[in-house]
């Protein structure tokens, strides 16, 4: 395995060298024309003719955007090319360490900051793996002036416990409007503890067409997620107090509750959004990138004309010399013959024709110069202008198709681990006794039709207005048992949803923006569901920098998922009717760039809160009598959140802090740490003016609380319901040190995570009974190519 890693690293380095040393590059101009250039930017000439001596700058423009999932609106976005905190982007615990996980990287996770948690999805089994998921509204679409490739790779450990992650993106345009590409992600974590390996793979293909009247976005994705479930270690003392145990274990020898238990989630997704715009044209100034692209195209056209003219001249010369047919050189005429005569009479004088009164008469050289200067000025302006289509009305259609399949598979189960057993074998008559093979499927097709009156087509239209109607069909499959049998079959269930809604928004300009959206369930299982969202921001100059004030509010009445009310497996089952969950949220944000300060305050009230719970008895050999399910709290729960982000700089010394305070009114149902802290202290400087270096350390800390445990049978974090076995975590700092580098289009880092392992209380748990990895050396590298 080490040889394979070395081979992969050498291959990547070789690819980089080849990219830098290649003699010929293919480039695409703004009109989609492909031409070649050498490494100096000169036009590539296979005949080695010196057709031009001017080095032309090749444009490397890449524009990125996301789209609204409902309407397909384009929203500008930034490519992930920032070197800062690159070393933290590889963790499933988040850039700021704000997520709990089950120890190993790439495992399930849950955000400790409640207001940042995403709402549950219809197929909630994949929610804890959201870091592997790129939803249509989060996917980056590209428009490129030249083919764009991005490759990232990070690694740690060896063939027994290591981790590997590779991410590859590619984008290319066929002309100005049509773009396409792919995005691949592969995660593989073997695990530093027993029975902890996991692997995830995602492949996405996209295509875009962004024309004046017609726009289209297509995204097709396939996912494979596999996680080995170990149920946690059998005794926390192996980590916190090893001296109390008669047997001493190394990290990879500590016994775990489960073995040969797996969660598999496969899914396929198609997203297609398109619209037809009705509007008019106007002239606007081009961006710097577009000006460079036009100049590049003009230089390419001029270069082509010169080559063709030179080729034509050489061809005529060869014809005149008779070289094409090896003919002798003919003697050409040398002047007028001696006997030449002038024929005819000399032409007579003609009458003057009347002047054209429609033409502008230039009386003097000064007037001529003035006209020429005015024309040159207008030509200069026209060279930087382009025609822009201004849409007034849009007709919108969006198709969203999703197909999920989940299997919980266990070859063995510990004695007395489960409290209940509801069937023996699966639908194929296998996995009887201690085996488990639970299967679940979900398929949905959603069509949305919208009509939009767009913002900004004239000075009076300060906001955009949209309306829509959507219809969704859903199909489910899950185990069910016939009376008198011990074998399950996959029962089928169907439901439909008809929703209507609208949106009023202002997104243009720099000072003031707002968005108001509402959606109502009319018929079907989502009848009565309501979502009202509002956000706004105000930006203005204060003491030489931008001050931003923002507010956000929403009211959501959400119906429970099908699997929240109906679920059957070999050892867990519930059949219940839940009320709609209601959430009311108000949030304010203050951000001032000059002092690098950001303050966020939020208040949220929840009613009929839906959550997962589990219970078991703790023994010396692990856990027994496990039960779990979906629960609902009918009372009101209030959550107060205050978060401060404050950065400081003194010369090359930088200090960043994120401090979050939370208070839940019902800690039994919604436990949250009172304080969550992330701090990052580092030196930032350049070597030889080209190599950017960040050298420092960061730490994550949160106060003790009864964090949710993990229920592997449904892949969810669940509240600890048994008072006798409840376990607190927290009060322990996680410290990393790193060196982060950025050289031109390459980022790379080397880091040591959890350098303080083995010190202090040794309570390095992010989930009860699931210890995190100890000290691990990691490295990563990221390249961007524009050819």
Spell out what each predicted region is:
Residues 220, 254-312, 356, 365-787:
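Exposed, low-structure sequence patches enriched in small/polar residues
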């Amino acid at each position: 395995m080490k040889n394979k890693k070395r081979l992969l690293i050498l291959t990547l380095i070789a690819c980089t060298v080849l990219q830098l040393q290649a003699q010929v590059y293919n480039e695409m101009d703004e009109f989609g024309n492909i031409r070649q250039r050498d490494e100096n930017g000169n036009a590539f000439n296979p005949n080695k003719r010196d057709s031009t001596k001017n080095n032309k700058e090749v444009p490397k423009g890449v524009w990125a955007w996301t789209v609204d999932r409902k309407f397909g609106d384009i929203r500008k976005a930034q490519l992930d090319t920032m070197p800062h905190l690159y070393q933290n982007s590889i963790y499933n615990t988040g850039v700021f360490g704000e997520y709990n996980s089950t120890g190993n990287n790439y495992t399930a996770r849950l955000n400790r900051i409640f207001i940042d948690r995403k709402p549950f999805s219809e197929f909630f089994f994949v929610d804890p793996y959201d870091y592997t998921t790129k939803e249509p509204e989060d996917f980056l679409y590209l428009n490129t002036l030249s083919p764009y490739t991005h490759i990232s790779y990070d690694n740690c450990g060896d063939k027994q416990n290591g981790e590997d992650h590779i991410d590859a993106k590619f984008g290319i345009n066929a002309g100005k409007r049509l773009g396409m590409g792919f995005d691949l992600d592969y995660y593989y974590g073997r695990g530093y503890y027993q029975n902890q390996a996991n692997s995830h793979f995602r492949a996405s293909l996209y295509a875009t067409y962004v024309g004046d009247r017609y726009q289209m976005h297509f995204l097709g994705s396939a996912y494979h997620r596999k996680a080995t479930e170990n149920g946690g270690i059998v005794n926390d003392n192996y980590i916190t107090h090893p001296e109390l145990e008669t047997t001493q274990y190394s990290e990879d020898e500590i016994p775990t509750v489960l073995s040969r238990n797996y969660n598999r989630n496969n899914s396929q997704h198609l997203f297609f959004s398109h619209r037809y715009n009705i509007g008019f044209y106007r002239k606007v100034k081009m961006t710097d990138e577009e000006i460079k692209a036009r100049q590049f195209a003009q230089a390419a056209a001029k270069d082509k004309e010169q080559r063709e003219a030179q080729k034509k001249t050489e061809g005529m010369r060869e014809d005149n010399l008779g070289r094409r047919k090896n003919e002798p050189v003919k003697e050409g005429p040398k002047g007028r013959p001696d006997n030449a005569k002038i024929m005819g009479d000399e032409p007579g004088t003609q009458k003057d024709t009347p002047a054209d009164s429609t033409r502008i008469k230039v009386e003097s050289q000064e007037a001529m110069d003035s006209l020429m200067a005015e024309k040159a000025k207008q030509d200069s302006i026209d060279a930087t202008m382009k025609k822009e289509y201004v849409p007034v009305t849009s007709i919108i259609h969006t198709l969203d198709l999703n197909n999920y399949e989940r299997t919980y598979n266990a070859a063995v189960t510990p004695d007395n681990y489960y409290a209940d057993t509801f069937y023996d074998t699966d639908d194929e008559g296998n996995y009887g006794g201690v085996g488990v093979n639970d299967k679940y499927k979900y398929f949905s097709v959603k069509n949305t039709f919208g009509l939009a009156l767009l913002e900004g087509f004239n000075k009076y239209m300060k906001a955009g207005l949209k309306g829509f109607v959507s219809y969704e069909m859903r199909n489910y499959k899950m185990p069910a048992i016939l009376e008198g049998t011990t074998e399950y079959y996959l029962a089928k269930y169907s439901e439909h949803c008809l929703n209507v809604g609208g949106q009023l928004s202002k997104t243009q300009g720099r000072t003031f923006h707002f968005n108001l959206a509402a959606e109502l369930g009319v018929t079907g299982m989502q009848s009565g569901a309501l979502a009202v969202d509002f956000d706004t921001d105000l930006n203005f100059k204060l003491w030489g920098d931008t001050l931003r004030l923002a507010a956000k509010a929403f009211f959501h009445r959400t119906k429970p998922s099908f699997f929240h009310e109906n679920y059957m497996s070999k050892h867990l089952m519930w059949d219940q009717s839940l009320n709609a969950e209601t959430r009311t949220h108000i949030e304010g944000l203050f951000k001032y760039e000059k002092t690098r300060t950001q303050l966020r305050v939020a208040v949220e009230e929840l009613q009929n809160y839906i959550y997962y719970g589990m219970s078991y008895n703790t023994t010396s050999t692990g856990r027994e009598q496990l039960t779990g399910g979906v629960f609902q709290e009918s009372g009101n729960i209030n959550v107060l959140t205050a978060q401060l982000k404050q950065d400081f700089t003194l010369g090359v010394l930088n200090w960043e802090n994120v401090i979050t305070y939370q208070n839940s009114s019902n800690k039994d149902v919604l436990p949250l740490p009172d304080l969550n802290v992330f701090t990052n202290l580092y030196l930032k400087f350049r070597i030889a003016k080209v190599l950017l270096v960040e050298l420092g350390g960061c730490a994550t800390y949160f106060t003790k609380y009864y964090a949710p445990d993990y229920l592997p049978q449904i892949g969810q974090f669940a509240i600890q319901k048994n008072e006798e076995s409840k376990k607190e975590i927290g009060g322990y700092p996680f410290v990393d040190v790193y060196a982060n580098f950025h050289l031109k289009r390459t980022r790379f880092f080397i880091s040591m995570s959890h350098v303080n392992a083995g010190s202090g209380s040794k309570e390095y748990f992010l989930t009860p009974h699931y210890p995190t990895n100890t000290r691990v050396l990691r490295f990563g590298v990221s390249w961007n190519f524009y050819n």
